[in-house]
UniProtKB/Swiss-Prot annotation:
Signal peptide: none annotated. Its EC number is 2.8.4.3. Monomer. The gene is miaB. Its cofactor is [4Fe-4S] cluster. It comes from Helicobacter pylori (strain ATCC 700392 / 26695). Catalyzes the methylthiolation of N6-(dimethylallyl)adenosine (i(6)A), leading to the formation of 2-methylthio-N6-(dimethylallyl)adenosine (ms(2)i(6)A) at position 37 in tRNAs that read codons beginning with uridine. This is tRNA-2-methylthio-N(6)-dimethylallyladenosine synthase. It holds the Pfam family UPF0004. SMART domains: Elp3. Residues 370-436 form the TRAM domain.
Length: 437
């Protein structure tokens, strides 16, 4: 039998899709890239914004038209968690709904009709941390915590993924060793507040924090690089930043989700920090790691965001000069504090602000790309580049998170670390050639 999975949203969803495939493989399901041939179609959903939810029902309609007569459609993930049985009412072609914290129950629901499994067990002793068989990969996703205890006014994630619990370190290290033995060179650690690791376990464990975990993972033979997402700026204290800077296996790229450059808006968002505090953390980080790559999230048009508030955001953009920007217009979500507010920034104003923000960021990327020419980076080979069935090079990421396209005549295998020199750029993209390998 064949299964097709459509994955929306974040890296956590990608990891959950891997888990779904692993569970289904025990029932002799094989993954297919063609939904028309599938016996089971799964849509793993995102609910951070309204747009992916609208897309969900469009996707369901399309799959219902092209699927095999007896094929089933299942909806999984965060939208499944908060909409539950309402999905079955709105889309009768859906056979079952499986919440974000119920992935391991896939084998129990695929043979049922109109099944709904979305409840989260909030008894901490009942949490089970099951790892699963994964395909051999150069880069592997690894959960280190589940859920979120933050109360950001705009965010539905605490409702859909439940309380924040850290996975015991010994289980994480055991899984990381298995991945390394299976060929993994780079780990991507996952958690809703990944750098708050160790704040709460499901039972008694030795006191450890995120930096302790990074140090232990770095000792595993075969693991060359470690990345993580998504951290919270509040937990980027001096101690963490210093250990981040010193650990040679921890990639010198970091996600620092700003959300807004206005202290007033940040207070309304319940983020727990100010514009000045955020800039202080960036300044400290750059003092320790001058070449660090920084990515961020920014929401424009949050309720009551004024022109001055937006200008504060633009000011932070200019000062930090982020390497990657994920930016969106505010989207009201159910089960959130801000979702109940009546105040709204007009869509045309929000759209104008978003366009200005994104256009300026594109200019910043081009300015930064010019400065990269002549610099060297060590790239982890991810994919080979081919032209007319001939290998012409490879592509991969630097330690600082830069995606680089490399031209070379020698054959380079995925997983190799290769020194390259940047020779040109185009629209923020970096091109390189091998150097002294």
């Amino acid at each position: 039998m064949k299964v097709y999975i459509e994955t929306m949203g974040c890296a956590m969803n990608s990891r959950d899709s891997e888990h779904l495939l692993s569970e289904l493989s025990k029932l002799d399901y094989k993954e297919t890239n063609d939904p028309k041939t599938a016996d089971l179609i799964l849509i793993n959903t995102c609910s951070v914004r309204e747009k992916p939810e609208r897309k969900l029902f469009s996707e369901i309609g399309q799959f219902a038209k092209i699927k095999k007569p007896n094929a089933k459609i299942g909806v999984c993930g965060c939208t499944a968690s908060h909409m539950g049985a309402d999905i079955l009412k709105k889309a009768p072609s859906v056979s079952f709904v499986l919440g974000a914290r119920n992935v391991s129950k896939i084998s129990q629901v695929i043979h049922k009709e109109k099944a709904v499994e979305v409840a989260i067990d909030y008894d901490e002793s009942a949490y089970a941390f099951e790892f699963f068989e994964k395909k051999a990969q150069i880069r592997s996703l690894l959960n280190i915590s589940i859920g979120c205890d933050k109360k950001c006014a705009y965010c539905i994630v605490p409702h859909t993924r439940g309380k924040e619990i850290s996975i015991p370190m010994d289980l994480i290290l055991k899984e990381a060793e298995k991945l390394a033995n299976n060929g993994t060179k780079e780990l991507m650690l996952l958690g809703q507040n990944v750098n708050n690791y160790g704040a709460r376990f499901s039972s008694e464990h030795a006191k450890v924090d995120f930096s302790d975990l990074l140090d232990k993972l770095s000792e595993i033979q075969g693991i060359e690089r470690i990345r993580f997402t998504s951290p919270h700026p509040l937990h980027m204290n001096d101690g963490f930043l210093e250990r981040f800077a010193k650990n040679p296996k921890v990639c010198k790229s970091i996600h620092m989700p700003l959300q807004s450059g206005s202290s007033a808006v940040l207070k309304m968002m319940r983020r727990g920090y100010s514009k000045e505090w955020f800039l202080n953390r960036v300044e400290r980080l750059k003092a320790l790691v001058p070449e660090v790559g920084i990515s961020t999230d920014i929401i424009v048009g949050f309720p009551n965001e004024s022109d001055k508030d937006f200008e504060d955001t633009m000011e932070v953009l200019e000062k930090v000069r982020f390497d990657t920007l994920y930016s969106f217009i505010y989207s009201p979500r159910p089960f959130t504090e801000a979702g109940a507010w009546k105040e709204r920034v007009p869509l045309e104003v929000s759209s104008s602000r978003l366009e200005r923000l994104q256009n300026r960021h594109k200019e910043i990327l081009e300015e930064k790309a010019k400065l990269e020419v002549g610099k060297t980076h060590v790239v982890l080979v991810e994919n080979r580049r081919e032209m007319d069935n001939q290998i012409v090079g490879f592509e991969g990421r630097s330690d600082t998170g830069k995606f680089i396209e490399v031209t070379c005549k020698e054959k380079r295998n995925p997983g190799e670390l290769v020194k390259v020199e940047i020779i040109s750029h185009s629209k923020g993209r970096l091109m390189a050639a091998t150097k002294g390998n």
